[in-house]
């Protein structure tokens, strides 16, 4: 059975409040029948996995990690499905190949992922108070889309999940190639 995938991207190291938000979000996303995809490094992916696993409805394939290197070690014990791509930063395009992208914090890697998501016509939801996600919340990156990055930087977990569901149900269309 296919479950919609939600890419969660952001800083390797996040504040305690951001980690708490991610943990609760991952827990609730499992309840709603979603899978989560991360880039696999740092506390973000560990927190997403812990939040998902804390939900009694968690299955053994609810968290997917796409690692930049060939070594699976960084994600062992912190993900259900581990894919060591060996693609380095190029794997960012794979990470955001999801129905919706949720961005929190972020430096250059997150900015790259947000740009790919934008080019792929993926809805991007910005949460948290730091980094590129916060800076680009409510903005349009260029002319490719008439929409903007969805600003959920002050939203509750329930509001974020509602926005994710809304994007999937009403506005989502698959990328058909760069034009």
Regions found by a protein language model. Give the residues of each.
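A short beta-strand-loop structural module common to alpha/beta enzyme folds
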Residues: 35-43
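C-terminal amphipathic helix plus adjacent low-complexity
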Residues: 168-179
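Generic N-terminal amphipathic, Lys/Arg-enriched alpha-helix
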Residues: 1-16, 25-27, 31-32
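Nucleotide-sugar donor-binding patch of glycosyltransferase catalytic domains
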Residues: 124-153
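Acidic/glycine-enriched connector segments
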Residues: 23-30, 42-120, 128-134
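Structural beta-sheet core signal
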Residues: 7-8, 38, 65, 126
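Short acidic-hydrophobic, aromatic-tinged amphipathic segments that line or gate anion-handling sites
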Residues: 82-86, 145-163
């Amino acid at each position: 059975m296919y479950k919609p995938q939600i890419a969660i991207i952001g800083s390797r190291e996040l504040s305690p409040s951001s980690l708490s938000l991610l943990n609760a979000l991952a827990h609730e996303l499992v309840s709603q029948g979603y899978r989560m995809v991360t880039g696999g490094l740092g506390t973000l992916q560990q927190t997403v996995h812990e939040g998902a696993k804390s939900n009694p409805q968690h299955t053994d394939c609810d968290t997917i990690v796409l690692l930049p290197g060939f070594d699976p070690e960084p994600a062992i014990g912190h993900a259900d499905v581990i894919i060591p791509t060996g693609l380095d930063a190029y794997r960012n395009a794979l990470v955001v190949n999801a129905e919706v992208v949720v961005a929190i914090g972020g430096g250059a890697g997150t900015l790259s992922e947000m740009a790919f998501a934008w080019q792929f016509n993926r809805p991007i939801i910005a949460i948290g108070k730091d980094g590129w996600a916060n800076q680009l919340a409510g903005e349009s990156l260029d002319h490719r889309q008439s929409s903007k990055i969805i600003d959920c930087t002050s939203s509750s977990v329930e509001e974020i999940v509602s926005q994710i569901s809304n994007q999937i149900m009403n506005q989502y269309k698959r990328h058909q190639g760069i034009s």
